[in-house]
Amino acid sequence: MPLGLRGKKKAAKSKEAARLVEGERSSGSQGVPGPPAPARKLVFHAQLAHGSATGRVEDFSSISELYAKIAGVFEIAPSEILFCTLNTPKIDMGKLLGGQLGLEDFIFAHVKGTKKEVNVYKSEDSLGLTITDNGVGYAFIKRIKDGSTIDSVKTICVGDHIECINGENIVGWRHFEVAKKLKELKKEELFTLQLIEPKKAFEIGPRSKAGKTSTEKIGTSRGTLRLRSKGPATVEELPSEAKAKAIGKVDDLLELYMGIRDIDLATTMFEAGKDKSNPDEFAVALDETLGDFAFPDEFLFDVWGAISDMKQGR
């Protein structure tokens, strides 16, 4: 393990300040109390991004459960959903649904559209791609760098799901695994990508290359629904401006070092480090919660620096 103290086990549980709001029970009259009022449920409105009627989804605690609910409303298979955006049907990478959902957000589900196979000549070490994933097994392109190798291939677009690399099916891979695979492709060789683009409405517009910064606030109300892979969802306050800025810096570092963007991963890393007193304790906490990522030491020190800057008001 890198960093001196990683061998020492540290408790890695993040403190949760918020709990799931179940609703308020009506105050009973004097005497024998009546039956409790049913819990107030959170209900969200959703549409298919290429066009559909409006549906209602509720009773979900994770991304996979949400996709299943949306699929049920629109009578499609959950596997047809590539990703969701909030409050816009456009393929806007600044509006991606991740692990947090504003209590008044409108959900647009982007489903599978045209399949395409593209041959790419890797003329540079870096392809100029930033990868993210939808949390349930689909990695897709979040950003294309101007002037990069991929930018010259106009059939490759932001939002395209990467299904295969050189014939190898990568469905189920996490974003960092896909980014690593692409980075390891040999320079000055041809490789093949099998992609699935989101189904589009009949509209014409320029190809998007980059989303907005990850410090953008999520949701239009004061609270957010935090979706988790394990355990119940919780309703939380929006992060402070300083916290959002620090999380945004961590997300930028993920892109710089690993070629991915993941605001939920950045948030998890921030939560793991906010109450630690030194980088060694932080590294131990990350090993216990996110050991599969095998983050390099230089990256961890830079992330620790971003967290420390927030603590010191910088």
UniProtKB/Swiss-Prot annotation:
Q: List the subcellular locations.
A: Cytoplasm
Locate the compositionally biased regions of type Basic residues: 1-12
Q: Name one GO cellular component term.
A: cytoplasm
MF terms (GO), sorted A to Z: identical protein binding
Q: Give the start-end ranges of region Disordered.
A: 1-36
Query: Where does the PDZ domain lie?
Result: 117-197
The alphabetized UniProt keywords are: Cytoplasm
Basic and acidic residues: compositionally biased ranges? 13-25
Which body tissues produce this protein?
Answer: Expressed in kidney and lung (at protein level).
Would the keyword Cytoplasm be found if you checked this record's keyword annotation? yes
Family to which this protein belongs: Belongs to the GIPC family.
Record's subunit section: Probably interacts with SEMA5A.
Q: Record's PANTHER family?
A: PDZ DOMAIN-CONTAINING PROTEIN GIPC2, RGS-GAIP INTERACTING PROTEIN GIPC
Q: What is this protein called?
A: PDZ domain-containing protein GIPC2
Native species of this protein? Mus musculus (Mouse)
Q: What is the lineage of its organism?
A: Eukaryota, Metazoa, Chordata, Craniata, Vertebrata
